Amino acid sequence: MKPTKLGFLLGLSLLCSLSPPVLSGVERLANYLCKDYNDPCLLDVEPGSCYEVHFRFFYNQTAKQCQIFLFTGCNGNLNNFKLKIDCDVTCHETYKNPPLPSGDKRKRSLRALATKNLATDWRLTTLQPGRLRQTERKETLLQRARRESRRQPLARHHT
């Protein structure tokens, strides 16, 4: 390779390596100025311009729900979800801004959740590696005790 070509390629690679910080600043500014347009839920449905057939979901702002549409495979926008649950979680108000429970309900639900989690998986109660075996042993003993308490003791007669 000639020194001139090598110098040109070296200069080009140097220019490309220095460009990303400038472009990322421009990208951040664009994101700040256009944040409403980056929300896929605010975009209209875009079926695309190819000839494939894909069933997808989009968020309909008027109906306030996710609806099915035919996507042709290319040139769509971000308001295009493969699964309805993805569309719901991203766009539906229930998932975007979940209602906060009142004080009493919240205390009860947290207590019930904690009790349920502790009852179903004893191994989660101890996270220290050295004590994990002890926790598993306690679980085994507890399960054995429950099994034995369910059985009716058989009367044994020794003669």
From Swiss-Prot:
Residues 41-91 form the BPTI/Kunitz inhibitor domain. Induction: By androgens. Expression diminishes after 1-3 days and disappears 7 days postgonadectomy. GO terms for molecular function: serine-type endopeptidase inhibitor activity. It holds the Pfam family Kunitz_BPTI. Residues 1-24 form the signal peptide. Highly expressed in the epididymis, in the epithelial cells of the distal caput and early corpus. Its main location: secreted. Disulfide bonds join 41-91, 50-74, 66-87. The keyword Protein biosynthesis does not apply. InterPro entries: Kunitz_BPTI, Kunitz_BPTI_sf, Prtase_inh_Kunz-CS, SPINT4. Keywords: Disulfide bond, Protease inhibitor, Secreted, Serine protease inhibitor, Signal. SMART domains: KU. One of its GO terms (cellular component) is extracellular region. It is found in: Secreted. Gene3D superfamilies: Pancreatic trypsin inhibitor Kunitz domain (4.10.410.10). This is Kunitz-type protease inhibitor 4. The gene is Spint4.
